[in-house]
């Protein structure tokens, strides 16, 4: 998911009929189809979909799958959004239950929960098993904002935050926005450009895109 930390190990694309472009961004390598094809990306050994900003070369959605778009949320924030064919309350319920975060994860890093409260409120803490670069670890996050059916946000021990927002466009369509927010993670880290220099900002952007594309496609498949 883009829910905690993303470090995709590789990305593979099945070409169907368009020109393929190769590239590299930090630790992330990709192959992009310019128009009209479905991209199949492998994130940490799991097949997921990847979408990009409309109007630029990239992997495009197929059928009813919505395009993941870049959101300008300001400095120190990596944000993407997608429209999902589901009610806002249903999508909120998934994110507001940490036990279901593995369902959302497009990065392959989320493993499961160690300790989760029965219901999240501001100040709640939940612990999660993770795996990155083949190494297992655990983190404890704290809920920093919660508004039923509209917003869930939690802070990571390093100081950055993950935020999910749900905008109801109709009873069956929701714009979902996920943001990796590190602008207030600390003066030292920000001064050293820690998240940019380590590649975390770029890898988390890729993980968010994979997660949102996966979520959108799951509901698009359900309607097919």
From Swiss-Prot:
Domain of life of the native organism: Bacteria
SUPFAM superfamilies recorded: Bet v1-like
Pfam families attached to this UniProt entry: Polyketide_cyc2 (PF10604)
A GO CC term attached to the entry: peptidoglycan-based cell wall
Matching InterPro entries: Polyketide_cyclase/dehydratase, START-like_dom_sf
Protein known as: Uncharacterized protein Rv0088
Organism: Mycobacterium tuberculosis (strain ATCC 25618 / H37Rv)
């Amino acid at each position: 998911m883009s829910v905690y930390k993303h470090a995709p190990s590789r990305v593979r694309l099945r070409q169907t009929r368009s020109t393929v472009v190769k590239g590299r961004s930090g630790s992330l390598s990709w192959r992009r189809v310019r128009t009209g094809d479905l991209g199949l990306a492998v994130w940490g050994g799991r097949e997921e979909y990847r979408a990009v900003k409309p109007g630029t070369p990239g992997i495009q959605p197929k059928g009813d799958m919505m395009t993941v778009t870049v959101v300008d949320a300001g400095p120190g924030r990596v944000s993407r959004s997608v429209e999902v064919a589901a009610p806002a309350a249903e999508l909120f319920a998934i994110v507001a239950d940490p036990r279901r975060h593995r369902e959302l994860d497009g990065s392959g890093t989320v493993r499961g929960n160690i300790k989760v409260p029965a219901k999240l409120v501001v100040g709640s803490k939940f612990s999660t098993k993770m795996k990155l670069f083949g190494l297992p670890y655990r983190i404890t996050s704290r809920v920093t904002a919660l508004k039923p059916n509209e917003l869930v946000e939690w802070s990571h021990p390093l100081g950055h935050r993950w935020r999910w927002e749900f905008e109801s466009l109709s009873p069956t369509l929701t714009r979902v926005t996920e943001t990796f927010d590190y602008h207030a993670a600390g003066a030292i880290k920000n001064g050293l450009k820690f998240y940019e220099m380590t590649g975390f900002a770029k890898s988390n952007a890729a993980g968010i895109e994979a997660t949102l594309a996966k979520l959108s496609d799951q509901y698009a498949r359900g309607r097919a």
